């Protein structure tokens, strides 16, 4: 799985990715461009994922059978083969921060922006913890789910942008209808090839063909 030294290195890299992505200098760019916001949020989650995996490696290499806290964290990260930590909880966190009211909150106050960054990082940490204990088949299933969710979100944004073109209210006041539409297309196209690849890989890992 890894060594304590690799875990420490992962922690440093993860923190660096989050710090670089949550840079206040980039905040005005998020206000102007939804693709930029999606990219920055993705990097924050990725940084959190590196930290989560590093934490898993550290706990696995350092805890003893008497260490109830570490044992509890490792057990929790493996619930339903990692589905709770890697799929359900991160999805709920991300979904919450992409609701129109949450987007407005994160853009209109320092507290909102801070809570969003922390939440996205936590989503990544949870996924990283679960990743360490997953089988090869679950790795493929998780990557398939991540890209599938990205494509689904892209389709929702495309529909929102397309519907708004016909005159209904724009529920994302910081972004134009065109940005919603183009961001949706971007997310859908980017996810298409990985979804197909990991769907086939997952079936092979499961021995179906």
Model-predicted regions and their roles:
Residues 1-209:
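Alpha-helical membrane segments of multi-pass proteins
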